[in-house]
C-alpha cells in the first residue's frame, strides 16, 4: 500500500501512532521501551520493538486466516506497520486458561490450576484508576461498549484463545493468559486491534 506518513497522533508506552495520507489507515512504530508494575518501572529492551512488530503481525495474519477481523494491513519494515484506524474500545480483554500471578492471589486459586473453560475478564482502560476490573454491566452503564459489541468482543476473544492455544501448543508453550484490545472502524465494526 502506498501512503504518505504524516504527523504523530499518539505516543504510548510501547508504540507511536502516525497519521497517513489515507484517513482510514495509520502507521504504528514499535519502540524498545518497556514498563512494569503499572508503569512504575521503566527501561529499554534492545530490539523489543522489532520482536513485538514481527510477532504481532504474524499472529494477526494467522487470526485473519481463521476468520477474526484485525487491524493489520501491511508490515513496512522491522518496526513499522500500517493498520486500520480504529477508535479503541476502552476495555482490556483478558483471557485466562490457567491460574497464575495476581489472579491466583485475588481469587485464592492455586497457581497452575487449569480451568475447565477459559475465563474472560474486563478491565477498564484508565491509567488514573489503574485499569480496574469491571464486568459487562459496568461497561454498559459507563457507555464503554454496547451489548452487541460486548457479545462480538467475547466471541472473538474466545476464538483468538483457541487459535493461540494451538499455535503455542505446537511450539511446546502453555498459554496461561493474555490481554487483547478491540477497536471500532469508522463504520462501527468491531475488530481486533493493538498488538498480541
Cite the ranges covered by each PLM segment.
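Short histidine-centered catalytic/ligand-binding loop motif
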Residues: 40-50, 133-156
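Conserved metal-phosphate-binding beta-hairpin within the catalytic cores
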Residues: 95, 175-194
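Active-site loop/lid in soluble adenylation, ligation, and acyl-transfer enzymes
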Residues: 2-124
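Coil-to-beta-strand transition motifs
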Residues: 25, 88-90, 172-175, 187-190
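Anionic ligand-binding catalytic core segments
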Residues: 108-148, 196
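A long amphipathic alpha-helix within ATP-dependent nucleotide-binding catalytic cores
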Residues: 144-176
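A short glycine-rich, hydrophobically flanked beta-strand micro-motif that places a catalytic Asp/Glu
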Residues: 74-79, 168-184
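Short Pro/Gly-enriched beta-strand edge/turn motifs at strand-loop
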Residues: 1-2, 76, 159-164
Amino acid at each position: 500500500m502506498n501512503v504518505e506518513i504524516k504527523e504523530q497522533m499518539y505516543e504510548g508506552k510501547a508504540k507511536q501512532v502516525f497519521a497517513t495520507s489515507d484517513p482510514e489507515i495509520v502507521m504504528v512504530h514499535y519502540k524498545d521501551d518497556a514498563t512494569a508494575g503499572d508503569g512504575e518501572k521503566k527501561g529499554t529492551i534492545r530490539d523489543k520493538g522489532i520482536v513485538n512488530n514481527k510477532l504481532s503481525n504474524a499472529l494477526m495474519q494467522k487470526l485473519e486466516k481463521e476468520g477474526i477481523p484485525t487491524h493489520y494491513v501491511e508490515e513496512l519494515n522491522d518496526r513499522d506497520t500500517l493498520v486500520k484506524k480504529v477508535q479503541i474500545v476502552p476495555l482490556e480483554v483478558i483471557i485466562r486458561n490457567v491460574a497464575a500471578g495476581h489472579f491466583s492471589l485475588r481469587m485464592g486459586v492455586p497457581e497452575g490450576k487449569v480451568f475447565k473453560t477459559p475465563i474472560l475478564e474486563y478491565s477498564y482502560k484508565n491509567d488514573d484508576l489503574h485499569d480496574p476490573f469491571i464486568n459487562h454491566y459496568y461497561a454498559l452503564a459507563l457507555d464503554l461498549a454496547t451489548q452487541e459489541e460486548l457479545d462480538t468482543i467475547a466471541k472473538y476473544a474466545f476464538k483468538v484463545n483457541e487459535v493461540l492455544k494451538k499455535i503455542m501448543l505446537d511450539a511446546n508453550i502453555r498459554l496461561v493468559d493474555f490481554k487483547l484490545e478491540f477497536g471500532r472502524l469508522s463504520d462501527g465494526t468491531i475488530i481486533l486491534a493493538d498488538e498480541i
